[in-house]
């Protein structure tokens, strides 16, 4: 941003891009922020989630010993394809490690440092970044306001495009 000579940018972030926007805005001066179904709140995990994760890790270590490396790799990839998101499945092993670390990093501690006006536009049916995350962000970011897109999921800005555009224009005071 500095290399481009941009001062006080308006940031727009969806999902992982929201995470990037939150971090940037907590460390830099920005004019405003628009977060749509943004990541940044560490998800609450059920016992079943941890059981799945640790059984997969155990499988990765034991299967090669029990059935051989080639067969084990095939079974591990089949299981990963069923359990992982499409982004995760397409990623290289290095990117998978980075994605896992990022998804599990909670940014709530930096949110109070954001001084810019912040619009939160969220689908109430979002399962990737649930509405409860938006409500938490609204509490933690000092000048944040939440608009809920009823019936929309993780891509609320596409599912309710006209409403999103109107909301953003009003927020930015664009006619």
Q: Where are the language model's segments positioned?
A:
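Conserved alpha/beta-hydrolase catalytic His-Asp/Glu region
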Residues: 35, 43-46, 61-116
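Conserved alpha/beta-hydrolase "acid-adjacent" motif
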Residues: 127-133
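Short beta-strand/loop motif that positions the catalytic acidic residue
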Residues: 114, 120-122, 126
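Catalytic histidine neighborhood in serine/cysteine hydrolases
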Residues: 138-155
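Catalytic histidine-centered segment of alpha/beta-hydrolase-like enzymes
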Residues: 152-165
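Conserved alpha/beta-hydrolase "nucleophile elbow" surrounding the catalytic nucleophile
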Residues: 9, 13-18
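Conserved acidic catalytic loop of the alpha/beta-hydrolase fold
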Residues: 1-9
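Flexible "cap/lid" loop of the alpha/beta hydrolase fold
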Residues: 19-65
């Amino acid at each position: 941003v500095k290399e481009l000579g941009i001062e006080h940018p308006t940031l727009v972030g969806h999902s992982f891009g929201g995470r990037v926007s939150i971090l940037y805005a907590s460390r830099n001066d920005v004019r405003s922020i628009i977060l749509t179904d943004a990541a940044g709140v560490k998800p609450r995990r059920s016992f079943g989630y941890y059981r799945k994760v640790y059984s997969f890790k155990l499988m990765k270590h034991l299967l090669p010993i029990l059935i051989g490396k080639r067969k084990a790799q095939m079974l591990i990839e089949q299981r990963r394809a069923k359990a992982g998101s499409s982004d995760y499945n397409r990623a290289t092993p290095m990117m998978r490690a980075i994605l896992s670390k990022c998804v599990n990093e909670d940014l709530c501690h930096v949110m109070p440092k954001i001084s810019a006006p912040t619009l939160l536009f969220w689908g109430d049916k979002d399962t990737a970044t649930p509405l409860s995350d938006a409500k938490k962000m609204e509490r933690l970011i000092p000048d944040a306001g939440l608009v809920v897109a009823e019936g929309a999921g993780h891509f609320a800005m596409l599912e309710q495009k006209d409403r999103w555009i109107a909301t953003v224009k009003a927020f930015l005071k664009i006619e």
